[in-house]
Amino acid sequence: MHATVTSSSSTATSGSRRLRWRVVDIVVASVIGVAVGVVFWAWGVVWGPISGPIEALLPGLQAGPAALWVVAGVLGALIIRKPGAAIYTELVAAVVSALIGSQWGGLLTIEAGLVQGLGAELVFALFLYRNWRLPVAMLAGAGAGLAMAINDLVIYYAGAAPLFTTTYIVSGVVGGALIAGGLSWLAVRGLARAGALDRFAAGRERREV
């Protein structure tokens, strides 16, 4: 009986330690957020020439490539693997993008980052921060893409036609799954293979395979 209680206590302690943020987690998550925030800003600079032809092809389809703006949360969560990582990295990226200069305004950019990070965070939380495989990464990307699409529709496209709304949501979800989910997962594997993530579970997993 004593051994069972001790074992259970040890397991609980181990689980708590696994989910606790370290200094290195905060530093790396911040670096990811800043780096991706610069990418967000650059994407905003070229967004007009890119989104125009896509929207002309099918209005609402532009939400697909817009999913690049939800990459930070998924990428950060896949590397840090701690509660709040998706929200934190996406929010930092949004703040950096806003500080450099966002065409959508600072407050709306930061609000979007918070919403998009939450969309990814909820999926990882649903799996109790234990499953980091490709399907879950893509599902988290889809969640972030869905959050982005709904947020955009409420703020920028209120009263849009049903066809546009449906196209925008579907495009955002698919784009989020492929760009934020799939590409982030591949990026983490590449970084782990290069030895850049040796202090994280993602790097240790790759080393053990």
Language-model features, listed with the residues they occupy:
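Alpha-helical membrane segments and adjacent membrane-interface helices in multi-pass membrane proteins
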Residues: 60-120
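Hydrophobic alpha-helical transmembrane segments
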Residues: 26-31, 67, 71, 83-91, ...
